[in-house]
């Protein structure tokens, strides 16, 4: 089964919901993966996307930072997500399609300007996250 998939580091899904609607209308991918949603799941404006035919969503989120979501025209189910590096940062979600295909959506922050684990905690966290992938 062929399908189209788009991915977008949205940097706040609520702030850019109108742009998401434009993308869904003009490009109409079957599946859209969003990173850095910066929103608790219950605050994602799913109803706006559902009105455009994207009736399925799986997501992980938290207020103010990180967060990932998968919007789909096709039926998907929540197949979990890993807590890489034990950070509890809502950076990974898995959607499973009816045919068993799994879509993994990750948000991996840049890790800061100093590429040194000792001098930059965030860089060390990024290395730990990537190692566990």
Label for each model-derived stretch:
Residues 37-40, 44-113:
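Structured beta-strand-rich core segments of catalytic domains in phosphoester-bond hydrolases
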Residues 109-130:
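Surface-exposed cleft-lining segments at the edges of enzyme active sites
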């Amino acid at each position: 089964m062929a399908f189209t998939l788009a991915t977008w580091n949205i940097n706040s899904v609520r702030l850019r919901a109108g742009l998401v609607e434009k993308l869904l209308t003009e490009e109409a991918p079957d599946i859209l993966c969003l990173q850095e949603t910066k929103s608790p799941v219950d605050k994602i404006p799913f109803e706006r996307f559902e009105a455009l035919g994207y009736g399925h969503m799986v997501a992980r989120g938290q207020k103010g930072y990180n967060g990932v979501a998968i919007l789909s025209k096709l039926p998907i189910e929540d197949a979990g997500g890993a807590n890489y590096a034990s950070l509890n940062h809502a950076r990974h979600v898995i959607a499973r399609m009816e045919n068993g295909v799994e879509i993994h959506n990750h948000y991996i922050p840049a890790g800061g300007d100093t590429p040194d684990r000792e001098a930059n905690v965030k860089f060390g966290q990024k290395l730990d996250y990537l190692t566990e992938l």
